[in-house]
Curated annotation (Swiss-Prot):
Coiled coil, from the record: none
Enzyme class, broadest EC rank: ligase
Name under which the protein is recorded: Methionine--tRNA ligase, mitochondrial
Gene name tied to this protein: MetRS-m
Residues reported to bind ATP: 320
The keyword Glycoprotein is annotated on this UniProt entry: no
An example molecular function term from Gene Ontology annotations: methionine-tRNA ligase activity
EC number(s) stated in the UniProt entry for this protein: 6.1.1.10
Any GO BP: methionyl-tRNA aminoacylation
Keywords: Aminoacyl-tRNA synthetase, ATP-binding, Ligase, Mitochondrion, Nucleotide-binding, Protein biosynthesis, Transit peptide
Transit peptide endpoints, chain numbering: 1-95
Transmembrane region(s): none
Amino acid sequence: MLIRRIKCLRYLGTRYNSSHYVTTPIFYVNAAPHIGHLYSAVIADAHCRYQRLRYPEQDVRLCTGTDEHGTKIQQAASLHGVPVAKYCDDISQRYREVFRSASIQQDDFIRTTEDRHKRAVANFWRTLHTRGHIYSAAYSGWYCVSDETFLTDSQLRLDEATGTRYSLESGHPVEWTEETNYMFRLSQFQDDVRHWVKTEARVRPAKFEKILLDTLSEPLPDVSVSRPSNRVHWAIPVPDDDSQTVYVWLDALVNYLSSVGYPDEKFSAHWPPAQQVIGKDILKFHGIYWTAFLLAAGLEPPGQLYVHSHWTVDGQKMSKSKHNVVDPLQAAQQYTMEGLRYFLLREGVAHSDGNYSHVKAQRILNSELADTLGNLLSRASAKSLNPGQIYPSPSAEHLADLLRSLDVAKRLQDSLLQLSERCESHYECNHFHLVADTTMAALHAANNFFESSKPWTLKAGAPDGNQARLETIIAMTMDALRLSGIVLQPIIPQLANRLLDKLSVPTAQRGWNYLAESFATSPNSSNSPAGLGESRQLDGQTSALLFQRILEETSAKEVKEQKPQPAKRSKSKKKERRETMS
């Protein structure tokens, strides 16, 4: 098998390759971005942020961008009454604005209308053609204009009343088309593609691997990889044949190569991608076509396809006709963009569709970010309790006594001791909701400890005043906040950094390795804030009000500063999806 020869090369390449290259799908500019597009981007961004945090020696690279060719783009531009190029510029810029607002830390934003990409597509085409994998043939079949693909009879349903056929997958109508196209010998790569899908957890979650294998259980027909230029002119011309343009999906998939410098030799420093994040609607194109194209070109397929499901809105599919498409920038006005990031990664799971609702978002963000996290910081740094505004060092004597005498102190210690290992395991699988679960459990333990130890009874002037014990309680609480802030950096980077700024944690001490240093790991040390040295001043320039509670029917601009509410667990029933499929 061809793939076995490529696997031999992989050991030589990855053995010396410190690159961790991650991609989002490039987003089709036939419409403005919605939360489903943002979800793809925040998954990839959180994954890359974790990789940088956990493996600082690794060269992590994230690529995103926009897909700008094809019939649907021509139609959308015409509908808006603007030239196609200007339409593409405008929509592509909106994606940039959304990603910038959401703190997506991409290293490259590729557009398929760029010259570097056109050059890569031409080279890739010539490689496939020279190797004998592309041939010209008369082709006829059912063509879906909306999906820009030919479909077989088994992929269609017939409306008996009208005689119209529709795609089973998308529901869009198809039309019979006869034309001369270039064809790709997909049938020759069926065994190789199946072998790739079945080995080494290539496709995750596992349900999507099964979907691909079910598709591969039937013979694969060769596929059309060009269109007549008189029908699809907004596209890249086929090299040496101006009568044809490159099929939009072949064009679009090559972006992953264009972004790292293909066809120049430098691209091999980043190839293959460690992980490609995609939505379930484009699984076939990536899992079968893309894999086959790469094998045909003599290139290694990606390390893993990470496939996520879609978002409904109040239980209904998002659609323009229902007027329920959620604009990320508008949603951010209500929840802040950090809040929206948290909600998407907290509530979304890859193997099943997530449901977006204002009620749910408000409940989760108020309960977890405003109360459980934000309120604990406000209480520990309150001037009435902490007039010196310090992150103190604990007393070894009082630390030992608290751990011995208070069950809640021991539970907090146990929770923090497990935080690093558990969250690392969840991050490695992109199980961001479980990272949030684990971190919130630690913060609940910290809130319970703080409440049970009653630090307000120990402050100066109180009958039981004991400054050393008070500072030890504050130090233990701030250790829990600091560790939580480090863990949450990939999910809510701006909010986590504000938390760590308030605690005066130096940038150099925000790495994953600092999760190993706290009162929990060094209970006999008198120098605890996690090995950070002596007591330090809190940052007076950073507000202790970390996340404002969201009020019903108000925008973020209208929310006035409010007194933090006591932290409490949400009474909502946990979703059965918490046991995540691997």
